[in-house]
């Protein structure tokens, strides 16, 4: 992109003057961030407009990625780097006596996602634009994100993530493209105003969906794709009559109900109202997005919908947007008078589905009454899809009534969204080799028998532009100095680093880069959280969504083990470690919140005990998010990837850590298996039961956690300390549910369903291997270099090329 320094200065000062009535000397940090971002957007805008123009001038097949979340992180540095103007902007700001780092730190993380699902979507958008494929995202513009996590008295407390308090300078509101989404109402059949016999809805609640567009800037080219986010409002808005009647609450009731749809990501759904709000969100996203797509198709191509799959492929990111399938049927049949068979043909050639989990709880299903009341016409269509599908199932599995019932899209009083997706989509992919194998052989075995041609694997990836080039500039420079440029868009080139594995100078430099990053993180935590950590210790890190299967509890048990050993045995002298945690627990997930409380309680005990000072430290990083990950990951020595084998679909933090030279301590789960295959077992620390072993134990019902407590007094002591009324909690009740979930089982489940006690000894042994390996500085550095050199497979660029080859069949569009 062309950069004119004087024009940039003029735009920046003009923005300050017009927007805030200030000059640079009067501007606040936020004013400067807004002005710098707006001025950068001015440079990006011509390419953004030209990208859209070329896509429309010569219609070509485009990907549309529907996702409940996009965990974008900060936009400023990423966009400047991808646009190739990062250094120039820094230089101009320096001339203007503006500190770029202060400007960058003023940007909030976009509150559009939470975990790996959303971060994957963000990486995919980056790769699509960089590889010059026509691909855009559709999501919801959440006003308050999921939540901002504060730790108070060791416990997670949720506050609104008010990331839009100042508006986002990177978004462009498109009121001209607003659409109406309808809920409820009564189904009618008869003549419409144009004389056609169709189904239609009367007395529906109408919600206005207004799009806000964000630019997705490709690296080193002119492509700027779009992430379109929908905001919900009421077309009626404020009721002045009710207000004048002094009914103030009722005057804004409709407005509030509408705006609640795009208020918060993943509202607590423990009750029926929360479930209904989630379904409203999902239908709102899909209906608005499909109306938008179909409107543009009719405008540019016409109403021959048999051509629709030639120009569109829609990827459903997990089950959240699966209601798009019956919604497209509704639009085609009810609004364009297309017949059922023709509509179904379009749907089954357009939609593809990515499965991200084998956890039954995450395969969404909706109570029939909720679904039917909220979306009566959509439910009617799902009923008909299911009726026709059951003929197919009975033909494939005659006489097997249990299987027929289980595979019903509607059964046991619920609508099964994953079943609907697998039936309707032409492709169903898992996200790591093990995950896809388990789907085909275990969780979705019946479906794989019915539709073997649909199932395929696409191992996840991450974008090296954000997770290496931007977040670890010293390491990026180290790489470029040795192998040149090109790795930024072809990460397989990192393989050339292997020839430096025994080069003393390279290993010394790698050690120093890691130390510098550790120093920076220590300094950041000192100033942001008032936490002191020693950057000469091993940084052992587990940062990810808090869930029992991810086994943060196993990690803290090992820390409790180390603490007990150090206190009880003066001769026990392990290497000094700093354990870093970062995680949010879902607001309604009680045991996950208890684990956060336990981590912070143990951390507090350790920091106040002089006997372990300098040997052991635990830090829980508050409000973990992308911008924090960009500081933590480059500084980490050990990457904790310790989920119960067979439960983590893929994971992507494991890839980011590998790319940044942290060694994997993990189970043979998700993408860990492929990481170990790439880097070599000798360059990782693998432990624990395998997925096959766990499947066998589950099938035999042979697991007895008590035997692990009986044979390991250290483990028995740790588990007992949860409830002994003296070590960590005077009442003995604070961690009672965690204790009982391991020893007795809770909520009708058997004890220790995630095999924490079974894997404890192996985990401790693996940690001892980590300690021993770390003592050999050069040997450790060699392992890190080999990990970096073999991380090329885990670029999202490779993942996107796999999707394009096997599923999407897109053609590159070179923007002039």
Task: Identify the meaning behind each predicted range.
Residues 1-816:
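A conserved ligand/cofactor-binding region detector
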């Amino acid at each position: 992109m062309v950069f004119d320094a004087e024009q940039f200065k003029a735009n920046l000062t003009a923005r300050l003057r017009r927007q805030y009535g200030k000059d640079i000397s009067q501007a606040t940090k936020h004013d400067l961030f807004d002005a710098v971002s707006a001025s950068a957007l001015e440079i990006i805008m011509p390419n953004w407009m030209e990208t859209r123009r070329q896509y429309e001038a010569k219609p070509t097949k485009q990907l549309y990625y529907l996702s409940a979340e996009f965990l974008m992180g900060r936009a400023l540095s990423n966009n400047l780097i991808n646009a190739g103007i990062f250094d120039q902007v820094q230089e101009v700001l320096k001339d203007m006596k503006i500190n770029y780092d202060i400007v960058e730190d003023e940007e909030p993380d976009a509150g559009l996602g939470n975990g790996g699902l959303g971060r994957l979507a963000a990486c995919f958008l980056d790769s699509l634009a960089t590889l010059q494929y026509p691909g855009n995202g559709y999501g919801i513009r959440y006003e308050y994100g999921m939540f901002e996590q504060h730790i108070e008295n060791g416990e997670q407390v949720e506050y609104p993530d008010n990331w839009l308090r100042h508006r986002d300078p990177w978004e462009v509101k498109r009121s001209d493209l607003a659409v109406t989404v309808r809920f409820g109402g009564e189904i009618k059949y008869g003549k419409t105003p144009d004389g056609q016999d169709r189904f239609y809805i009367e007395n529906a609640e109408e919600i206005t969906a207004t799009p806000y567009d964000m630019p997705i800037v490709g690296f080193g080219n002119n492509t700027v794709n779009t992430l379109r986010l929908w905001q919900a409002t009421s077309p009626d808005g404020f009721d002045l009559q009710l207000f004048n009647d002094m009914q103030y609450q009722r005057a804004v009731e409709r407005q509030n109900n509408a705006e609640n749809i795009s208020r918060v990501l993943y509202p607590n759904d423990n009750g029926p109202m929360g479930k209904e709000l989630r379904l409203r969100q999902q239908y709102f996203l899909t209906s608005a997005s499909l109306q938008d797509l179909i409107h543009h198709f009719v405008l540019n191509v016409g109403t021959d919908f048999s051509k629709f799959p030639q120009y569109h492929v829609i990827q459903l990111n997990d089950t959240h947007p699966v209601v798009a399938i019956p919604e497209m049927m509704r639009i085609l049949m009810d609004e364009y008078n297309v017949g059922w068979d023709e509509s179904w043909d379009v749907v089954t050639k357009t939609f593809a589905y990515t499965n991200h989990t084998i956890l039954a709880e995450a395969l969404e299903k909706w109570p029939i009454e909720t679904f039917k009341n909220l979306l009566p016409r959509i439910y009617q269509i799902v009923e008909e899809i299911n009726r026709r599908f059951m003929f197919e199932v009975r033909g494939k599995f005659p006489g097997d009534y249990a299987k027929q019932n289980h595979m019903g899209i509607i059964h046991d009083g619920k609508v099964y969204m994953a079943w609907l997706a697998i039936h309707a989509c032409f492709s169903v992919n898992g996200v790591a080799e093990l995950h896809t194998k388990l789907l085909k052989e275990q969780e979705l075995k019946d479906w794989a028998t019915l539709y073997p041609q649909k199932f395929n694997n696409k191992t996840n990836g991450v974008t090296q532009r954000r997770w290496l080039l931007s977040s670890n500039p010293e390491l990026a420079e180290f790489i470029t100095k040795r192998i040149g440029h090109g790795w930024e868009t072809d990460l397989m080139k990192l393989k050339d680093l292997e020839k430096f594995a025994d080069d003393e100078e390279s290993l010394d430099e790698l050690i120093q880069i890691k130390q510098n990053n550790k120093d920076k993180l220590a300094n950041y935590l000192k100033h942001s959280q008032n936490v002191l950590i020693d950057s000469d210790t091993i940084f052992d890190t587990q940062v990810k969504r808090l869930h029992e299967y991810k086994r943060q509890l196993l990690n803290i048990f090992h820390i409790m083990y180390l603490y007990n050993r150090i206190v009880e045995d003066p001769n026990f002298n392990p290497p000094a470690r700093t354990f870093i945690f970062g995680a949010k627990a879902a607001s309604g997930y009680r045991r996950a919140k208890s684990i956060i409380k336990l981590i912070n309680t143990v951390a507090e005990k350790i920091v106040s005990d002089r006997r372990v000072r300098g040997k052991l430290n635990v830090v829980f990083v508050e409000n973990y998010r992308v911008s924090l990950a960009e500081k933590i990951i480059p500084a980490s020595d050990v990457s904790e990837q310790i989920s119960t084998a067979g439960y983590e679909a893929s994971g992507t933090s494991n890839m980011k850590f590998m790319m940044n030279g942290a060694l994997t301590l993990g189970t043979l789960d998700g993408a860990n298996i492929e990481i170990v295959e790439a880097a070599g077992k000798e360059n990782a620390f693998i432990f624990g039961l395998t997925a096959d072993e766990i499947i066998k134990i589950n099938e035999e019902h042979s697991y007895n956690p008590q035997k692990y407590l009986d044979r390991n007094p250290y483990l028995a002591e740790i588990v007992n300390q949860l409830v002994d009324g003296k070590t960590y909690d005077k009442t003995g009740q604070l961690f009672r549910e965690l204790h009982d979930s391991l020893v007795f089982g809770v909520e009708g489940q058997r004890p220790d369903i995630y095999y924490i006690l079974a894997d404890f000894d192996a985990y401790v042994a693996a940690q001892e291997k980590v300690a021993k390996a770390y003592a050999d500085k050069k040997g450790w550095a060699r392992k890190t270099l080999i990990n970096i050199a073999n991380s090329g497979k885990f670029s999202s660029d490779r993942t996107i090329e796999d999707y394009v080859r096997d599923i999407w069949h897109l053609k590159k569009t070179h923007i002039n």
